[in-house]
Amino acid sequence: SYESGKVVDSYGGGICQVSTTLYNAVLNAELEVLERHNHTMIVTYVDPSKDAAIAEGLMDLRFANNTDYPIYISGYAYGGELTFTIYGHETRDPNRTVEYVSETTGTTTADGVALYATDQPVGYLSQTQGALQGLTAVLWKYVTENGETTKEQVNSSTYQATPVCYDVGVNTDNPTVAAAIQSAIANNDLDQVQ
């Protein structure tokens, strides 16, 4: 999961891989997307703008069956892979093709570092995450039918850049050292903690 610009272990972490896989199945079935959110930071398991983040009470993935027939959604996980298949009655031309293309429209980088306190002793310093590039991206839908291709924007997404992250030991009985370390963490001053 992402928390305050850092990758952290949490209950439910990774659930967005499920919502993202379902989102891509919904796109391929050309169902109506009612609500979709991108992640705060870029994810590596899918192209930019093809992700779907969920967070209880904050973000959801919602879609509607905009076809004239019922649909059936099958989902299963096997061998480390997750698959969703959406079944329905196809009424469009069988020679029609649909392709989704992610286009990166801009990039950003984060300056400096981010420091996080741990219960390790003073002097402990461990890099927990490398810098992540931020970017903006657009997802395009290309439909080719009867030799004609149309292009439609599906969504646009902005992903934050994050700096290199370090865990810093703060455990000490010396109040002067503890205050200096806490000040360094508050100011993200790596030189002061080394």
Question: Predicted regions span which residues?
Answer:
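Well-ordered beta-sheet/strand-loop patches within structured domains
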Residues: S1-Q194
